[in-house]
Amino acid sequence: MTGLFITLEGPEGAGKSTNREYLAAQLRAQGVQVLLTREPGGTPLAERIRELLLAPSDEAMSADTELLLVFAARAQHLAEVIRPALARGEVVLCDRFTDATYAYQGGGRGLSQQRIAVLEEFVQGDLRPDLTLVFDLPVEIGLSRAAARGRLDRFEQEGRAFFDAVRSTYLQRAKADPARYRLVDAAQPLADVQASLDTLLPQLLELRRG
């Protein structure tokens, strides 16, 4: 069996983490070895970078600094966790990956997509997700859910225009490559979202066999 790299993407409050756990349980019930991870993070070093990226601070972080920190964490994550798991034939379920960089640093911060692509090639080589699930919902619903969780991180404190750009970028990327992306209506009740994931399970198992 070959490894399979599945990423879960979407804006704040989309339920990626909850649904990642659900999807992992469904795959494990079929006897599949699953590794759960997240970005930024996934290793001790990358988690420390995550803290820098998410912690509110009196010192403004430049968009370029943010971008480079994201890819520094990703390089460590790939070397230490993702590539070895794929080599072992496992299914990797990752909460965010490079699509988030295009959405947040590209769309939200307004950085050049070409600049991001150069770093993507440098850090990842030819590694891309086999499948990306984009959990989509209206910005106001996502921000309301994020606020209900408690203290907001540095990204969650951004304004409506930032998240409009994030959502728009995700949708543009999904439309441009329908073979890799699946849109999930994350505004639905959780049971309905998970029912839609159930319909994807045969596709995931077929991808793994392929």
Swiss-Prot record:
CDD domains associated with the record: TMPK (cd01672)
Any Gene Ontology CC annotation: cytosol
A matching Pfam family: Thymidylate_kin
Substrates-to-products reaction catalysed: dTMP + ATP = dTDP + ADP
Keyword Amino-acid biosynthesis attributed: no
Highest rank taxon of the organism: Bacteria
InterPro entries listed in its UniProt record: P-loop_NTPase, Thymidylate_kin-like_dom, Thymidylate_kinase
Top-level class of the enzyme under EC nomenclature: transferase
Binding site for ATP: 10-17
EC number: 2.7.4.9
UniProt keywords, alphabetically: ATP-binding, Kinase, Nucleotide biosynthesis, Nucleotide-binding, Transferase
Biological processes annotated in GO: dTDP biosynthetic process; dTTP biosynthetic process; dUDP biosynthetic process
Function: Phosphorylation of dTMP to form dTDP in both de novo and salvage pathways of dTTP synthesis.
Classification via PANTHER family: THYMIDYLATE KINASE, UMP-CMP KINASE 2, MITOCHONDRIAL
Family the UniProt entry places it in: Belongs to the thymidylate kinase family.
Protein name listed in UniProt: Thymidylate kinase
Native source organism of the sequence: Pseudomonas savastanoi pv. phaseolicola (strain 1448A / Race 6) (Pseudomonas syringae pv. phaseolicola (strain 1448A / Race 6))
